[in-house]
Amino acid sequence: RRAAGDIRCLSGSRDGFTTALRRFGTYGPMVRRVLKDSGLHSDIQYLPFVESSYSPKAYSRVGAAGLWQIMPATGRDLGLVLNATVDERLDPEAASWAAARYLKNARKTLTVAARAKNSKVSSRELSPFVITSYNYGVNGMRRAIKKMGPDYIQVINQYRSRKFQVAVKNFYAGFLAARHVARNQKQFFGDIKPGRPLQYQTLILDRQVSIARVQSVFGLSEAELKVLNPALTRFVWHGWRLIPDGYKLRLPRRQDSWRNQVARLRMMPFETRQGGSVEYTVRTGDTACGIAAAFRVVCRALFAVNC
């Protein structure tokens, strides 16, 4: 009864969670593999339900992107490529490895902080702190532990900080709720047909290449390539930039491994981006100098032809 006043209900999310469960069928096996190889608990596979509804295309109003909702600066710190042609935050596998690196560091950092206050604290007791740090930040949780000790309920009820507000306090509870529903999806939603895990093989490009050439050589549609290569930006898909050399191009898995097509691609002349002008529709969050950098022109020159 005392806790009843603290219970919060979220309505209107049934269809969204059903869609997330289908996506979970597509990306969940890969996420579980990454977590296992990283030495992290398998329960973390339910975190993207809270972050993005398991959508690799998700964007937040503050600039976080992808399955794991990674901010640009954080992504670069975690080793992801973010430039005009590639944004690995949108690649579910690359982003999952980055998230795993973040969570491993969080676990290590918060364990040190917690055991400085209580040497007998267990990894299980630290799990809520690690999960919450994904929303609040490692340093924020470290400060909370330093001030209140490694008692999560005490931190939730008594810790005071300008940014430690309702959304942060509810984050772990939301994670537990998502885990419960995902584990018991038949009870809540009946039979849901999960998405099929992606099957692909990787070709490391030894040169820059246009998306048009890839489509032509391999006989693949833009839609087929987009599903497997979500990290490529709109500048590539519109033909304004080439796919960079060294990029790990994903292709549908085939028994012959596309041998003839790969050989043909490597025999073709090198491509260079065509000159001239292009039209670009400005989107929310764009800046003039950011667009200029994407097209490799001087910001001042962009102003000159548009003013």
Predicted regions and their residues:
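Short, surface-exposed glycine/acidic/tryptophan-bearing loops
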Residues: 58-79, 244-246
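Extracytoplasmic and endomembrane cell-envelope/extracellular-matrix remodeling and assembly machinery
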Residues: 1-33, 37-38, 77, 82-85, ...
